[in-house]
Each structure stands twice: as structure tokens, then as C-alpha cells.
């Protein structure tokens, strides 16, 4: 079955009520991760539990996040999306350049709005790997804070500790992370 992403705005209920196969299709997990996650085990978590996965490069953070996301989508009637932190910043810039709507190269002109508050679960992969600018810090902080305030589940992967994140971005971004379930992964897997 070949699914397409709708160009017109869709509600939370619309995204939740798609088939499991369609909800998995719309996750947009990168192929390099999707092709390797079968070997990994999902974290035992509920669809309303925020997660912060910290560890060095190669420790399996992204694979565990992907496996956890897909398992939650398969086991519950929830919607989700995968987004790299640096790609999210590019999406925001592109939406500013196009009057709030993303150009055709993106899966949906509304993906930024969906990530901010429509999708039930969002993985933000590689927090701290993007080029640090005031703009990036503000936008990532805004995303995490909005999702936190709306009680939307967020799974974050980072090489940085919460203290490093606080030092890099400030408490606006770091404070919500104190309520996240925190997993520290050690070394290469």
C-alpha cells in the first residue's frame, strides 16, 4: 500500500484514526535507522511518558527511540513523527521564507505545526548536534516547551546531559526535561 501525506490541514483525531500501517508510514524515520532497528528492544513506556535518552555517539539512542516510537504506534491509537533537531531548524527557516507554509520538498506544508502540537508523540533526534545560534536555541526551546505544556509526548536523544543542555540552551529548554524519564546509555552497543 502506498500512502501519501495530505496537503490540507488535518486534526489530531484524523492522524490518530489512520490505520497502523499508515501511521507508521508518516513517522518518517530515516532509512539508516529504520533498516537497523529490528535488532533493538523498545523501552517499556506508556504513550504519555516523555523520554530523554542520553549517551555517546553509537550507543543506540536513535535506534532505541525509533523502536520505542514504532512500538507505541503499533500498540496504541496514537500519531507520531520523527524529526532531527537540525532539520527542524531548517524547516522553521523555510516556513518563514514561505509565509508559514513549507515548500513542496517537505512531506506536508504543515509539518512544523503538526510537530509542535498535533502529533501525539514526536522524537527529536540529536538535540545539541545542530549549530548553536540564538534562533536555534529559541526554536528548539519553544518546541519542547509547547509540547510539554500541551502534554504531548516527546522523546529526545542527545549526547549532552541535562546540565550540558541547560548550559547550552538555558533553563527554558532544560527545565521541562527534569520531568522526563531519563535513560543514560553507556558506550557502543
Segments the model singles out, each with a brief description of its role:
Residues 73-118:
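Short glycine-rich substrate-engagement loop in P-loop NTPases that contacts/grips substrate
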Residues 79, 118-121, 150-156:
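Loop/turn-to-beta-strand initiation segments
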Residues 1-43, 181-183:
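A short, basic N-terminal segment
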Residues 52-54, 80-84, 156:
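A structural signal for short, well-ordered beta-strand segments and their strand-loop junctions
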Residues 40, 114-115, 176-177:
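A generic structural signal for nonpolar/aromatic side chains embedded in well-ordered alpha-helices
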Residues 48-66:
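Walker A/P-loop nucleotide-binding motif
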Amino acid at each position: 500500500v502506498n500512502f501519501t501525506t495530505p496537503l490540507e490541514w488535518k486534526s489530531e483525531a484524523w492522524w490518530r484514526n489512520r490505520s497502523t500501517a499508515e501511521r507508521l508510514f508518516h513517522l518518517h524515520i530515516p532509512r539508516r535507522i529504520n533498516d537497523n532497528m529490528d535488532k533493538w528492544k523498545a523501552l517499556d513506556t506508556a504513550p504519555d511518558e516523555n523520554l530523554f535518552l542520553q549517551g555517546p555517539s553509537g550507543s543506540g539512542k536513535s535506534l532505541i527511540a525509533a523502536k520505542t516510537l514504532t512500538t507505541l504506534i503499533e500498540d496504541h491509537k496514537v500519531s507520531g513523527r520523527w524529526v532531527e533537531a537540525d532539520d527542524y531548524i531548517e524547516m522553521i527557516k523555510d516556513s518563514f521564507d514561505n509565509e508559514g507554509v513549507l515548500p513542496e520538498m517537505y512531506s506536508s506544508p504543515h509539518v512544523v505545526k503538526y510537530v509542535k502540537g498535533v502529533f501525539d508523540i514526536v522524537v527529536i533526534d540529536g538535540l545539541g548536534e545542530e549549530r548553536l545560534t540564538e534562533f536555534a536555541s529559541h526554536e528548539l526551546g519553544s518546541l519542547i516547551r509547547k509540547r510539554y505544556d500541551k502534554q504531548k509526548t516527546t522523546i529526545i536523544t542527545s549526547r549532552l546531559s541535562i546540565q550540558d543542555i541547560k548550559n547550552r540552551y538555558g533553563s527554558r529548554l532544560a527545565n521541562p526535561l527534569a520531568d522526563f524519564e531519563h535513560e543514560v546509555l553507556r558506550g557502543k552497543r
